[in-house]
């Protein structure tokens, strides 16, 4: 049974780290491109009432986050500042066939739609973050692997 020298083991571990790091970077880049493409395909433009980036196409983490904020603010304003809980409480106190109940149900539906849209946009923001983290980790692995491969007997 032959044993590997410590230097040979370091070189092998370095090679594995470089391979793993390269894979992390490649997969992260692919994920970033996929998320960006899907956001672009939706053809969403940040509306004029956005605090920043109004008129820009939603295609990156910043524009997706700004769009989510705008949706939240518009939904709250459209519901008169009411939350789902407020609307549910109000619905219990009115006749189900009244105009007020219809309006409350419309507000509830609008809040629900807005929550769904915001969740989708914030999920893309999170996916961008995970992708960037994985790419950074991959780059670190490549650097460490390179240093391990350069190790010599001194």
PLM features per residue range, with description:
Residues 1-54:
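N-terminal extramembrane/targeting module of integral membrane proteins
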Residues 2-13, 126-154:
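Juxtamembrane interface at the cytosolic side of transmembrane helices
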Residues 14-15, 21, 30, 48, ...:
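Residue-identity detector for glycine
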Residues 18, 22, 61, 67, ...:
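Generic hydrophobic/packing signal
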Residues 21, 87, 101-104, 131, ...:
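Amphipathic coiled-coil alpha-helices
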Residues 36-124:
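Extracytoplasmic/periplasmic regions of membrane proteins
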